[in-house]
From Swiss-Prot:
Pfam name, any one: ACPS
Organism of provenance: Emericella nidulans
Phenotype upon gene inactivation: Unable to grow on minimal medium unless supplemented with myristic acid.
Composition-biased stretches (Polar residues): 580-590
Region Beta-ketoacyl reductase, residue ranges: 651-848
Gene name tied to this protein: fasA
Functional description taken from the UniProt entry: Fatty acid synthetase catalyzes the formation of long-chain fatty acids from acetyl-CoA, malonyl-CoA and NADPH. The alpha subunit contains domains for: acyl carrier protein, 3-oxoacyl-[acyl-carrier-protein] reductase, and 3-oxoacyl-[acyl-carrier-protein] synthase.
UniProt-annotated catalytic positions: C1279, H1519, H1560
InterPro entries given in the database record: 4-PPantetheinyl_Trfase_dom, 4-PPantetheinyl_Trfase_dom_sf, ACPS, Acyl_Trfase/lysoPLipase, Fas_alpha_ACP, FAS_alpha_su_C, FAS_alpha_yeast, FASI_helical
Name the UniProt record assigns to this protein: Fatty acid synthase subunit alpha
Length: 1858
């Protein structure tokens, strides 16, 4: 059979087999069963590229056949040919024979298994245990030139040897990186001495062959150097190059040449870090040697044993006893020598043992004491008495002046947005809180907002104005009055309901009988039936009856006995309730009106019963404490007054414990600070959450003059008790207060402890609630006594309890409370009554507290018995009443007992009653649940299983909808039209700079996710999804998972599907922990750990060191450096050198410093540029900060809707796209490598220098994305870089050097910068912050009292800016207008970082007596219209003279001159010149009118350009670094600017301090701030500084700034200011304006056309963004320029060259021939020229030329249109494609006709209907009226008209023939 037929048949067979394979089911499970069960196969070998089927077979064996094989003794082998070659071929290692000379070794135990384990761990399949002898030698062969070439290339490319194909040249392999190519060529030159011509273009195999001829087979300088570096930097200490070669020789039998080959291969397999031990190094070498053998096609031999035999375990074995016998004498000698030396040195060798024995005895004694203490007190007690008080952690809140303005503004907008619609209790409560903080600053602030409230916008604005005016009046009235606690909330009662399904619901509902606290006081005074008691007369009558019944007791009937029992009970009850009520000497006659409930009720039941109020005071007598009408009357008067007029605590100092969230104490605390008190409150659970709770409380309730101090405190600790009181009274290191009130409410529950289970917790509780409470009072007494404060006793509100063991199961709780009552007697018996007064409050049932919340459900049932339970609000009101001056005065006379029990003490068996009520509720619930369950079962039986589906509640969980939104476009009628009248056509749009895109990479991901966190303080579901993607927690998957098709998110680690709605729940905690400001994560900074910051210490060695081995080159370098202090000698066997450092040589020894800057703002953990699509080779080449810049550039373009950067070149020339991105420092990683790593001689890329330049990052942007030839400017402005960049970009566009610019800044975080900032004391000290109780997230606190330095951060921020005209033409979104950019330096000084005030010059002006008329936009409009008319007249005159010019030139050059071409070009020039002049006029009178005018400040002028004033700047984003000096200086600068420019009083800016969230990224700072302000413009939401817990008092004087701590939704921001300050006297400011002011310069048609473009672009960007997320392709690097190489110079030199879509590939690229430049108005110009030529060719004719601006015709003015156009022409114009242009053309034509008749125009108001323009080919007008008469008088026979349009104007030529 012929070969060709064989080949054809083989091909056919292969195709058929493959078809069969693909078409048939695999049935592998069945196949396995046949092989394993039916055939019982024991040895299976897989032949294939990987161990696939074998792995499946192993799993099948383990799951199905393991027990079967064990039972049948079947042993199976699963082998794969590419891993188990030796086992398949039965190629076993030779067994070493036993040595005859040591017969006993056979019986000895085998040697340690450790070496064997090491061998098993090695990846080499042929590895075996170390042997007694060397391996058999392998035939040696030197390395080839190709081996070295390929290795050097692979090592430089950081690729495996197999990934470097030999058929490719170096130029192809480096991928266009010329620097890398030059490095490789340099290495080859160093290695071989010389290289062939153009080695970069020669394939590697040819290059190696050409070098082989002159190659000597030895390693050259470069390869030897790399190998030496590998061994010294990655091998363990002592394992030098000689040891490496010796191991390769003895282990594998490799000669010098083969060793070279192995070491060359090792260069391409270099470990990431130094290998830890010698066995691990040998494992690495084994792996390399085996791969070398596989590559070289040789077989490595196993080492053989030396001698005649060897031990099976690899070495001769000896009996340990024999070894011990051999060494016994030696050890004895050593011991003897040691003892002699010790005696000589007078040392006791047993000192340590003796000390240990003594310490053991001491330890036993101490341990016994500890055990005893532990046994007696228990673990809970031990941990519960640990002190926690720390004055450093004290938080002081006193900035009520700032929170007042914040609350007033929030309330204003709440009313405007309809959240507060009616004047309800909540509004009244807010008003009272604002009144309590009333101050002149607040009044000015409110007055401005109310005076400028735009009531025409709707009812809510009118309501806001009405309420605001009323509130202002109220605030004025209380301006000099003390703040008061006044609660206007509705009193509530308990309500427990059980629905039909048996669900128990408890809620607080308003009490119908008490709508306010005044009613509540009345009810408390009235008491109830349960608190009734018999008066004196009734008791006497009852006693007489009882006496009579006793006398005839033996004759009593059954009914009489019952009567006797009832009477007796009444008498006993009356006596027990209040014995002194029947004694006239105490309270007088019962008929005398008393201050009790019966009097208040109006009808005392004299002679029958009276009531005790639910709230009453008791007085002590000889029998105990009894209800006192007199004292109770005083107390109820106080409560009534407090409910009506409020209660002030101004000037009072209070200590509170036990005021945690949800407690009575917290409500009391609110009342105290509302009343102006200074309170120190303690917390046993000190944390950020707790301090934020108290801060929020103070911000809401804190009144003028109040102060809240929060400290950590454990009342179980005696040390804390003393330290706390010392802190309060210490005038230097503490508060320096003298206490007026002590409210010690701290307690811990002891539920479930009866008398037989009193434990450690009970003892601790007793200590807290009794022992240390008394200690606390004692400490206060001692301090008052020591300071001589005898006339200012502190009132103690003792928390008593009615529970005197009544409830039980509460440990020592009742004993603790009962014991407090001894203080009532001690007050008399001890000597502290001058310092402390006692008011004991028996606190009743208070619902919702931690102790009583479990009983809420039965509270309603208990109240039905006639008693009263209390809400926390009510009980706090009761307690605050006890702190009123009247009660305080009573306490100074005698201790006061306040019974606030609500009559609860009158209920017998309360516990049983509660149990019964709870049982009834639960039984009812259970019955209803059972009924519902039964009904459901019945329903299923009757109607089917699925019948309930329609009735079940289904909660629809929202899915993530990741939007990619452009800014909201304003509506024309509501937002733009009101501005259009003044702004239309008033600016030169080519000179207006707008922001069309922005982006950032920072600690919170990107600008979208950062805004979510900044605006709302949390991530949405969409934000979590995007952050999870950014951090690599999830990725998108589209394909099969577990046999099912799946498209969606999967977990990156497990590959398991993750539903987007579950992303927030699953990943949010991790995201928050690893984003933002946090502890430095070493893995993000190449292992940098600030706790172990490495420094080098130089030392001089004092004795010769042991020699070590190095290469000849390295050894000579040591000799060169150290001279005689080093010895070097050659090792003859290896050619290496030994080096010995001698005495006097210097060494640099690393040491670790514990650095205190532990926290920084870091990009989210897991951020990876690969995820965005940046190629691997770029990531390895560039500095990490370059990656930030590249990602930002891609995202900035995407936010502008530009998905292909080459799209710019459809609209502008290559030279008009600029790059102004800058940095403060640049590539810090590159700088670190260049200076530190290079100094330490670490491996480093050769072109590291280029990556350190600050402009390199911009270069990479251009090389990978833009390919532009536009201006590149690289600002370096330290922390102000980004704003300086905006300034440069703005000027570049305004000056016409570019039309598009990328601006922004970037900087990285690096340990060197962190250390030097710390040395300057500029940054926050994390250790100090931790000591002050701050979390990392709190450490950046701009404007606060405790700010302590800025927090470093890293990232990049960017904006894409362009001229407004280009933005409109492209249809890109416009985020904001850049109205002004300025930079400034400062004065003479010596401090580089000192903050300056040079930016004040932005407001520089020296105004005249009257404001400049240029500030009036109407005045400027008049001037502009006048200038436009002049330009049109000039244009008309130039067109009229064209023919004469042409005739004159033709007369001089009759042959070559073409009149038509000349006229065409000149007319186009006139048209262009007219447009230029008009734009110049717009620029001069619109954009630029204020420049060089000392009467107008740049800031004022920039705003006036858009019709705005300084009062309309809504927000200011501050540099706000959280340093003491900057925050104060910056606020001062802004305030001075506003004041100087006449901003109205009270019109305070809202301050944004973004760095509390992001930290300070230096170069990127201004860009992030600017981005945030653009988001504020779009949303109207002003984010607050959430870390502003207490604004510094020094900021109060800056009255033009509000410092919000929470986000405030406004009704719109018109303009903003961004200020930025940088080290080195850099100050910068940017003013941004809402884009609606730009749209107001357009007409409606232009705006609608733009809107359509933007919407189309947004859809395209949305698709691109989502594809980028799914495919990791947001960044797409360009591989080539948009033009072919041969077109480069043509494209560069032709400013009109533009790209076009390639018909085949759809790529944007420059066509071979530039498009013919066409003037937009060429056709219209041609028509004008033809008309003029016709006119000059016609005798007896007169020409009229008129030019009109298209936008000068107001077509919306119907009256005007009626006067100039008849109905037929109006209809024609309205139907035209551009009605505006058509109307302008008709107007121009009529004016031209007038001019051709020789009649002067009568102006815009003249009726032009007399001239009717026909639409025929001649365009002959029909004249009527005055026009017809004028034509008749002039003898006009015929008139023709030609009309033409351009984008901006209409030109008409009329010719009248006579």
């Amino acid at each position: 059979m012929r070969p060709e037929i064989e080949q054809e048949l083989a091909h056919t067979l292969l195709v058929e087999l493959l078809a069969y394979q693909f078409a048939s089911p695999v049935r592998w499970i069945e196949t396995q069963d046949v092989i394993l069960a039916e055939k019982r196969t024991e040895r299976i070998v897989e032949i294939g590229p990987a161990d696939t089927l074998g792995g499946m077979a192993r799993r099948t064996l383990a799951s199905k056949y393991e027990a079967y094989d064990a039972a049948t003794s079947v042993q199976r082998q699963i082998l794969c040919y590419n891993k188990d070659a030796k086992e398949i071929y039965y190629d076993v290692d030779p067994v070493e024979e036993e040595t005859e000379s040591a017969p006993e070794a056979a019986a000895a135990p085998p040697t340690s298994a450790a070496p064997a384990a090491a061998v098993v761990a090695a990846p080499a399949p042929a590895a075996s245990a170390p042997s007694a002898g060397p391996a058999a030698p392998v035939e040696d062969a030197p390395v080839t030139a190709l081996d070295i070439v390929r290795t050097l290339v692979a090592q430089k490319l950081k690729k495996a040897l197999s990934d470097v194909p030999l058929n490719k040249a170096i130029k192809d392999l480096v991928g266009g990186k010329s620097t890398l190519q030059n490095e490789i060529l340099g290495d080859l030159g160093k290695e071989f001495g010389s290289t062939p011509e153009k080695p970069e273009d020669t394939p590697l195999d040819e290059l190696g062959a050409s070098m082989q001829a002159t190659f000597n087979g030895q390693l050259g300088k470069q390869s030897s150097s790399l190998i030496a570096r590998l061994v010294s930097s990655k091998m363990p200490g002592g394992f030098n190059i000689t040891a490496v070669r010796k191991y390769l020789e003895t282990r594998w039998g490799l000669g010098p040449g083969r060793q070279d080959g192995v070491l060359l291969l090792a260069l391409t397999m270099e470990p990431a870090s130094r290998i830890g031990s010698e066995p691990d190094a040998k494992v690495f070498l084994d792996d390399v040697a085996n791969k070398y053998a596989a590559n070289s096609g040789i077989s490595l031999n196993v080492p053989t044993a030396s001698g005649d035999g060897g031990a099976s375990a690899g070495g001769m074995l000896m009996d340990p006893a024999a070894i011990d016998a051999l060494t016994k004498d030696q050890r004895a000698l050593f011991k003897q020598q040691l003892e002699i030396i010790a005696r000589y040195l007078k040392m006791d060798l047993r000192d340590g043992q003796k000390a240990f024995v003594a310490s053991q005895e001491t330890q036993k004694t101490l341990q016994a004491q500890l055990d005893l203490w532990q046994a007696e007190h228990g673990d809970f007690y031990a941990s519960g008495i640990e002190p926690s008080f720390d004055p450093l952690k004290a938080r002081v809140y006193d900035s009520s002046w700032n929170w007042a303005r914040q609350d007033a503004l929030s309330m204003y907008y709440d009313i405007i947005f309809g959240r507060l619609k009616v004047v309800d209790r909540e509004i009244v409560s807010q008003c009272i809180r604002i009144m309590n903080r009333s101050n002149p600053l607040l009044l000015e602030f409110m007055q401005y907002h109310i005076d400028n409230c735009p009531t025409e916008r709707g009812e809510t604005y009118q309501l806001a104005k009405e309420l605001g005016e009323q509130l202002i009046e109220n605030c004025k009235e209380v301006l000099g009055v003390s703040p008061v606690y006044k609660d206007v909330a509705v009193p509530t009662g308990p309500q427990t309901t059980i629905d039909a399904r048996g669900n128990i619901e408890y809620q607080e509902v308003p009490r119908a009988s008490a709508r306010k606290l005044e009613h509540y006081v009345k009810q408390m005074a009235e008491g109830g039936p349960i608190s009734e008691y018999s008066n004196r007369a009734k008791v006497q009558n009852d006693l007489r009856s009882v006496y009579k019944l006793i006398r005839r007791q033996h004759r009593l009937s059954k009914s009489s006995q019952l009567q006797f029992n009832a009477l007796y009970k009444d008498v006993v009850r009356a006596l027990s309730m209040n014995e002194n009520q029947i004694m006239p000497q105490e309270n007088g006659s019962t008929k005398k009106p008393g201050r009790n409930g019966s009097v208040r009720n109006g009808s005392p039941r004299a002679g029958k019963v009276e009531t005790i109020p639910f709230l009453h005071l008791k007085k002590k007598n000889e029998h105990g404490w009894d209800y006192s009408k007199k004292l109770t009357g005083i107390y109820l008067d106080v409560l009534e007054s407090a409910a009506r007029s409020g209660l002030t605590f101004q000037g009072k100092n209070v200590l509170m414990t036990g005021a945690g969230a949800g407690s009575i104490g917290a409500e009391v605390l609110q009342g105290l600070i509302s009343g102006g008190a200074k309170v120190i409150v303690t917390t046993s659970r000190y944390s950020r959450e707790v301090t934020e709770y108290y801060q929020a409380m103070y911000a809401r309730y804190g009144a003028r003059g109040s102060q809240l101090v929060v400290v950590p405190f454990n009342q179980g600790s005696k040390q804390d008790v003393e330290a706390l009181v010392d802190y309060i009274y210490d005038t230097k290191k503490g508060l320096g207060w003298d206490l007026d009130f002590i409210v010690p409410f701290a307690a811990i529950p002891e539920n479930g402890r009866e008398i037989d289970s009193i434990d450690s917790k009970s003892e601790l509780a007793h200590r807290i609630m009794l022992t240390n409470l008394l200690r606390l009072l004692g400490s206060v007494k001692a301090q008052k006594q020591a300071n001589g404060f005898e006339t200012r006793p502190a009132q103690v509100i003792l928390p008593l309890s009615p529970n005197h063991g009544t409830f039980g199961n509460d440990g020592l709780y009742s004993e603790s409370k009962l014991a407090l009552e001894t203080l009532f007697n001690r007050w008399y018996s001890e000597n502290w009554s001058n310092y402390l007064t006692i008011c004991g409050a028996v606190i009743g049932w208070t619902r919702g507290t931690g102790l009583m919340s479990g009983n809420n459900m039965v509270a309603e049932g208990v109240e039905k018995l006639g008693v009263r339970t209390f809400s926390q609000q009510e009980m706090a009101f009761n307690l605050l009443g006890l702190m009123a001056p009247a009660i305080v005065n009573l306490c100074q006379l005698d201790p006061v007992w306040a019974d606030l029990n609500g009559g609860l003490q009158f209920i017998p068996d309360l516990k049983d009653l509660m149990t019964r009520l709870r049982t009834e509720i639960m039984e009812t619930s259970d019955v209803r649940r059972a009924v519902i369950k039964e009904t459901a079962i019945e329903n299923k039986v009757v109607n089917g299983e699925d019948s309930e589906v329609l009735y079940k509640k289904v909660i629809a969980e929202p899915r993530a909808n990741i939007k990619f939104q452009f800014p909201n476009l304003p509506t024309w009628d509501e937002d733009i039209k009101p501005l259009n009248e003044n702004l239309k056509g008033m600016v030169n749009l080519d000179k207006v700079v707008v922001v069309t895109g922005f982006s950032e990479v920072g600690p919170w991901g990107n600008s979208r996710t950062r805004w979510e966190m900044e605006a709302s303080g949390k991530f949405s579901l969409e934000g979590c999804v995007e952050m999870a993607w950014i951090m690599g927690l999830i990725r998108h998957h589209n394909g099969p998972i577990k046999g099912k098709t799946y498209s969606g998110w999967v977990d990156s680690k497990t590959g398991e599907p993750v539903d987007d709605k579950d992303v927030k729940a699953k990943y949010e905690k991790y995201i928050l922990e690893h984003s933002g400001i946090r502890l430095i994560e070493p893995e993000l900074f190449k292992g940098y750990d600030p706790k172990k910051k490495q420094l080098l210490q130089e030392i001089v060695i004092e004795e010769d060191l042991e020699p070590f081995e190095a290469s000849k080159e390295t050894a000579e370098e040591f000799k060169r450096e150290h001279g005689e202090k080093v010895e070097i000698f050659e090792v003859l066997e290896s050619g290496e050198y030994t080096v010995r450092l001698k005495k006097g040589a210097t060494l640099l020894i690393p040491k670790a410093l514990q650095f205190d800057r532990l926290v920084a703002g870091q990009v989210p953990t897991g951020w990876d540029a690969r995820r965005y699509g940046i190629p691997e080779d770029i990531i390895e080449q560039v500095d990490p900060v370059t990656l930030f810049v590249l990602v930002c550039t891609a995202e900035a373009m995407l936010s502008a809707g530009v998905t292909d950067p080459y799209e710019f070149y459809k609209y502008v020339h290559l030279s008009e796209v600029g790059n102004c991105i800058g940095s403060g420092i640049g590539g810090t990683h590159a700088l670190r490598g260049m200076y530190k790593d290079r100094y330490l001689d670490k491996p480093l890329q050769k072109d590291i220098l280029q990556e350190s330049f600050i402009n390199t990052m911009s270069a990479w942007v251009n090389m990978l994305l833009l390919s532009s030839t536009g201006p590149i400017k690289t600002p370096v402005g330290a922390c102000a870089t980004a704003v300086e960049s905006v300034d440069i970009g703005y000027e570049t566009i305004v000056e016409g050097k570019a039309r598009v610019c990328f601006v922004g800044g970037f900087d990285d975080f690096q340990e060197e910068g962190s250390y030097e900032f710390a040395n300057m004391k500029a940054t926050s000290n994390a250790e100090d912050e931790f000591a002050h109780g701050r979390t990392p997230q709190e450490m950046s606190r701009p404007t606060t009292t405790t700010r302590a330095g800025f927090m470093e951060s890293q990232g990049c921020g960017m904006q894409l800016i362009m001229s407004a005209q280009l933005a409109l033409d492209m249809g890109v979104p416009i985020y904001g207008i850049i109205a002004l950019t300025t930079t400034a330096t400062d004065k003479i000084g010596r401090s580089v970082p000192a903050p300056g005030q040079g930016v004040l010059t932005t407001a520089r002006e020296n105004p005249g007596k009257f404001p400049s008329p240029l500030l009036d936009i109407k005045y400027r409009r008049r001037q502009l219209e006048l200038r436009k008319r002049q330009i049109r007249e000039w244009q008309e005159s130039e067109l009229l003279y064209l023919q004469e010019e042409a005739e004159a030139i033709k007369a001089q050059n009759p042959a070559d001159f073409v009149v038509e071409e000349y006229l065409q070009e000149r007319a186009q020039h006139i048209n262009r010149e007219a447009i230029r002049q008009e734009k110049d006029a717009q620029f001069s009178l619109g954009n630029n009118f204020w420049k060089q005018d000392s009467r107008i400040a740049p800031l004022r002028g920039a705003l006036a350009t858009w019709g705005l004033t300084v009062d309309e700047i809504g927000v200011a984003s501050f540099h706000g670094t959280s340093t003491v000096a900057n925050d104060k200086n910056e606020s001062d600068v802004i305030c001075q600017q506003m004041k100087h420019l006449g901003r109205k009083k009270g019109n305070a800016l809202l301050g944004i301090f973004q760095k509390y969230l992001t930290g300070h990224p230096k170069g990127a700072a201004g860009a992030w701030m600017f981005n945030g302000c653009l988001q504020v413009l779009d949303s109207g939401l002003v984010p607050g500084n959430r870390n502003a817990d207490n604004v510094d008092k020094v900021m109060e004087k800056f009255d033009y700034i509000v410092y919000p701590s929470r986000s405030i939704q406004t009704d719109g921001i018109k303009a903003f200011s961004v200020t930025s300050f940088g080290f080195g006297q850099k100050g910068a400011q940017v003013i941004g304006i809402h884009p609606k002011y730009l749209y107001a310069t357009l007409d409606r048609a232009q705006f609608e056309a733009y809107r359509a473009k933007v919407e189309t672009r947004q859809k395209k960007a949305y698709r691109y963004f989502h594809n980028g997320l799914v495919n990791n392709s947001i960044f797409v690097a360009k591989n080539k320029a948009p033009y072919e190489d041969e077109l480069q110079s043509k494209v560069f030199l032709n400013p009109d060259y533009r790209v076009a879509a390639d018909k085949k590939t759809s790529e944007l690229k420059y066509p071979p021939k530039p498009p013919v430049a066409t003037d937009a108005g060429s056709e219209s110009t041609k028509a004008v020229i033809e008309s003029l030529a016709k006119a000059h060719a016609t005798e007896n004719s007169k020409i009229g030329v008129d030019v009109e601006s298209i936008d000068s015709i107001n077509i919306s003015n119907e009256t005007f249109i009626e006067r100039i156009l008849p109905a037929s022409e109006q209809q024609y114009c309205q139907n035209a494609p551009s009605p505006q242009s058509s109307f302008a053309g008709r107007w121009s034509a009529k004016e031209a006709v007038f001019k051709s008749l020789g009649v002067c125009s009568k102006g815009a108001g003249a009726p032009l209907k007399d001239i009717e323009i026909e639409n025929d080919s001649n365009g002959a007008p029909t004249l009527h009226g005055v026009a017809a008469e004028a034509a008749k008088e002039a003898g006009v026979k015929h008139i023709s008209v030609s009309i033409s349009h351009s984008d901006m104007q209409a030109v008409a030529v009329a010719i009248s023939q006579f």
